[in-house]
């Protein structure tokens, strides 16, 4: 069993719309926070990858909304590295209300490895190693349960 990486984010007043719930696009931003923090957890950053000429633009994004997040809620962001292809990688996400565990949203993003000009590249060795570490971390965390 694998375990997702977990991060938390508080819903700020500016994250909400006139109905008092989190604006829909913010869920994708929270996906990004989860993904970014997962990279940090395995010892790297997007900046470091970009400095080495590897960019990971979003190629596809999907979000299924279940329950609204509201101002001052704390969201638990669960992120899992899902797969890597020749030049693509996918991350899966679940956003949960920290206090009651309600699923707020689920989704995924697919990224393509490119150079700074947008030319598709095979994932570089460092990225492959980071993805391997993400998989190992998820398996290790899952075996502790």
Where are these regions (language model features)?
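A broad, structural micro-motif
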Residues: 22, 56-58, 104
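Short, flexible helix/strand-to-coil boundary loops that buttress conserved ligand/catalytic motifs
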Residues: 23, 42-43, 135
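Residue-level recognition of specific faces of alpha-helices
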Residues: 27-30, 55-57, 92
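Hydrophobic beta-strand-centered segment that forms part of the acyl-chain substrate-binding groove
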Residues: 38-89
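Catalytic strand-loop segment that frames the active site of acyl-thioester-processing enzymes
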Residues: 1-38
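HotDog/MaoC-like acyl-thioester-processing domains
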Residues: 3-7, 70-71, 81-145
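Solvent-exposed, charged/polar functional surfaces in cytosolic regulatory/catalytic domains
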Residues: 37, 64, 133, 137
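Hydrophobic residues in beta-strands and at strand termini
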Residues: 9-13, 65, 113
């Amino acid at each position: 069993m694998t375990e997702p990486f977990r991060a938390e984010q508080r819903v700020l007043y500016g994250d909400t719309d006139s109905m008092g719930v989190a604006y829909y696009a913010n869920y994708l931003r929270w996906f990004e926070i989860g993904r970014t923090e997962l990279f940090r957890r395995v010892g790297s950053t997007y900046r470091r990858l970009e400095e080495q000429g590897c960019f990971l633009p979003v190629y596809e994004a999907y979000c299924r909304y279940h329950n609204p997040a509201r101002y001052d809620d704390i969201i638990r962001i669960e992120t899992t590295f899902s797969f890597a292809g020749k030049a693509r990688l996918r991350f899966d996400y679940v956003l949960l209300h920290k206090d009651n565990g309600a699923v707020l949203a689920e989704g995924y993003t697919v990224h393509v490895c490119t150079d700074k000009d947008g030319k598709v590249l095979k994932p570089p060795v460092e990225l492959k190693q980071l993805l391997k570490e993400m998989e190992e971390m998820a398996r290790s965390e899952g075996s502790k349960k």
